């Protein structure tokens, strides 16, 4: 059984010279290039309103894409009664505040116990929406806000909005090192050449842009507010590591805890107990996919993140007092 779904997008200028199938794979990363190629060959892809069936044809940027996608029904995942922290819900979307240690979608090593399983239990009709309406993902140990579509029209609009960078996603993080100013990381990303589970900055990768500003400085660490312009896998984690400021606790990208000299035992206990990357999706702003209403949601920092910040503040204050006296 297949589902019909309309996908729309605009070819961005940075895809100039790409083959059509390559460009569409960049625009629709949830679908494999082989599947996209089948859509092209089956006359399901229109470029500027005209059916195009040559996957190897070049694009120039600015073309309007419409795909009448045929999507095979996914394996039926099991609904599971996993609590969801719902921040906003209406007839078309759900916005949740994801806790740590929760995978978004079933995969290798995580066949169930995910956000997707929880959504199937909470709202059974979402089983008819591809990927149970999941528009974007957060890593297992990243906390915070995610938007989910409850029906196919909402999903189609949200996917397009994400591609056109009309959804604003802001994060808080603790980065290693003392940073002196905010800035922007504009570095393309791809799969790491040797680490199967990691991503890396790569000149032939997909465009990736992260903006960041300093909120607070501590000894050896800096609290940041970040905004995604694109949304690649592990983007903030990779970009911060690339500029030599990996996120505290991010073992995959070099962020193992580095206690400052003379740290108290109480501070060391908190630091050692924080066994994940210090990253939280704190704000999500979007236009409602059906009625166009502006929706902005905020998620407070989780308890372990608050405890970490308080410990960093206490350590910094103790250090300043020791200097003074």
UniProtKB/Swiss-Prot annotation:
<keyword id="KW-0698">rRNA processing</keyword>
<dbReference type="GO" id="GO:0003723">
    <property type="term" value="F:RNA binding"/>
</dbReference>
<protein>
    <recommendedName>
        <fullName>Ribosomal large subunit pseudouridine synthase D</fullName>
        <ecNumber>5.4.99.23</ecNumber>
    </recommendedName>
</protein>
<dbReference type="Pfam" id="PF00849">
    <property type="entry name" value="PseudoU_synth_2"/>
</dbReference>
<feature type="active site">
    <location>
        <position position="139"/>
    </location>
</feature>
<dbReference type="InterPro" id="IPR050188">
    <property type="entry name" value="RluA_PseudoU_synthase"/>
</dbReference>
<keyword id="KW-0963">Cytoplasm</keyword>
<dbReference type="InterPro" id="IPR006224">
    <property type="entry name" value="PsdUridine_synth_RluA-like_CS"/>
</dbReference>
<dbReference type="InterPro" id="IPR002942">
    <property type="entry name" value="S4_RNA-bd"/>
</dbReference>
<dbReference type="InterPro" id="IPR020103">
    <property type="entry name" value="PsdUridine_synth_cat_dom_sf"/>
</dbReference>
<dbReference type="GO" id="GO:0000455">
    <property type="term" value="P:enzyme-directed rRNA pseudouridine synthesis"/>
</dbReference>
<keyword id="KW-0694">RNA-binding</keyword>
<dbReference type="GO" id="GO:0005737">
    <property type="term" value="C:cytoplasm"/>
</dbReference>
<dbReference type="InterPro" id="IPR006145">
    <property type="entry name" value="PsdUridine_synth_RsuA/RluA"/>
</dbReference>
<comment type="function">
    <text>Responsible for synthesis of pseudouridine from uracil at positions 1911, 1915 and 1917 in 23S ribosomal RNA.</text>
</comment>
<dbReference type="InterPro" id="IPR036986">
    <property type="entry name" value="S4_RNA-bd_sf"/>
</dbReference>
<dbReference type="GO" id="GO:0160140">
    <property type="term" value="F:23S rRNA pseudouridine(1911/1915/1917) synthase activity"/>
</dbReference>
<feature type="domain" description="S4 RNA-binding">
    <location>
        <begin position="18"/>
        <end position="78"/>
    </location>
</feature>
<comment type="similarity">
    <text>Belongs to the pseudouridine synthase RluA family.</text>
</comment>
<dbReference type="Pfam" id="PF01479">
    <property type="entry name" value="S4"/>
</dbReference>
<dbReference type="InterPro" id="IPR006225">
    <property type="entry name" value="PsdUridine_synth_RluC/D"/>
</dbReference>
<keyword id="KW-0413">Isomerase</keyword>
């Amino acid at each position: 059984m297949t589902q019909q779904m309309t996908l729309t997008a605009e070819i961005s200028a940075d895809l100039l010279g790409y083959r059509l199938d390559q460009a569409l794979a960049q625009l629709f990363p949830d679908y494999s290039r082989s599947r996209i190629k089948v859509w092209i060959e089956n006359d399901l892809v229109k470029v500027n309103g005209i059916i195009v069936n040559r996957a190897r044809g070049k694009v120039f940027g600015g073309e309007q894409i419409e795909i009448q996608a045929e999507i095979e029904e996914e394996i039926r995942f099991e609904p599971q009664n996993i609590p969801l922290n719902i921040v906003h819900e209406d007839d078309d979307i759900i916005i949740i505040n994801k806790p740590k240690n929760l995978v978004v979608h079933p995969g290798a090593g995580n066949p169930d116990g995910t956000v997707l399983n929880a959504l199937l239990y909470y709202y059974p009709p979402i089983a008819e929406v591809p990927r149970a309406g999941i528009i974007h993902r957060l890593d297992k140990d990243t906390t915070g806000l995610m938007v989910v579509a409850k029906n196919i029209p909402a999903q189609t609009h949200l996917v397009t909005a994400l591609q056109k960078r009309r959804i604003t996603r802001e994060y808080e993080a603790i980065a290693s090192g003392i940073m002196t100013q905010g800035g922007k990381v504009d570095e393309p990303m791809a799969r790491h050449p040797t680490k199967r589970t990691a991503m890396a900055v790569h000149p032939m990768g997909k465009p990736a842009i992260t903006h960041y500003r300093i909120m607070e400085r501590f000894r050896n660490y800096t609290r940041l507010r970040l905004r995604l312009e694109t949304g690649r896998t592990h983007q903030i984690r990779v970009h911060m590591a690339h500029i030599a400021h990996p996120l505290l606790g991010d073992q995959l990208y070099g962020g193992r805890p580095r206690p400052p000299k003379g740290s108290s035992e109480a501070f060391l206990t908190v630091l050692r107990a924080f066994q994940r990357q210090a990253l939280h999706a704190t704000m999500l702003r979007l236009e409602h996919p059906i009625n166009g209403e502006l929706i902005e949601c905020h998620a407070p920092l989780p308890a372990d993140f608050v405890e970490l910040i308080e410990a960093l503040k206490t350590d910094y204050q103790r250090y300043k007092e020791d200097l003074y006296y």
